[in-house]
Regions:
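Predominantly soluble domains enriched in secretory-pathway, periplasmic, or organellar proteins
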Residues: 1-102
Length: 102
């Protein structure tokens, strides 16, 4: 799967910027409060080829660099169904994203 980025500064004429590789089933995403990291849930459907069951971490400040992947419980038969950052966890989410990059 891919994440497609658009420039929406002119909403009536969105401009395609780039496609960033994620994983099979790239679906929901959430932006960190500082707008640096994009977390992408990769589980569109629980079907072969439609669900990697991971979360891709993308650094938008570095031109859409894929930092890595967060493993979920796919091996145990679970897939993420939605993704969100909780208010009290913003700092921890940014910290974890920066650790994935190391």
């Amino acid at each position: 799967g891919f994440v497609n980025l658009y420039d929406n500064s002119d909403p009536s004429h969105p401009r395609f910027l780039q496609a960033i590789p994620a994983a099979q089933g790239a679906h929901h995403s959430v932006l960190s409060p500082d707008e640096r990291y994009l977390f992408v849930q990769n589980s569109l459907l629980n079907l072969e080829g439609m669900s990697d069951g991971s979360i891709t971490v993308i650094d938008l400040a570095k031109g859409g660099t894929v930092l890595g992947s967060i493993d979920t419980l796919k091996a145990q038969g679970f897939n993420p169904n939605c993704i969100m950052l909780l208010p009290n966890h913003f700092r921890q989410a940014n910290l974890r994203a920066s650790l994935v990059a190391k």
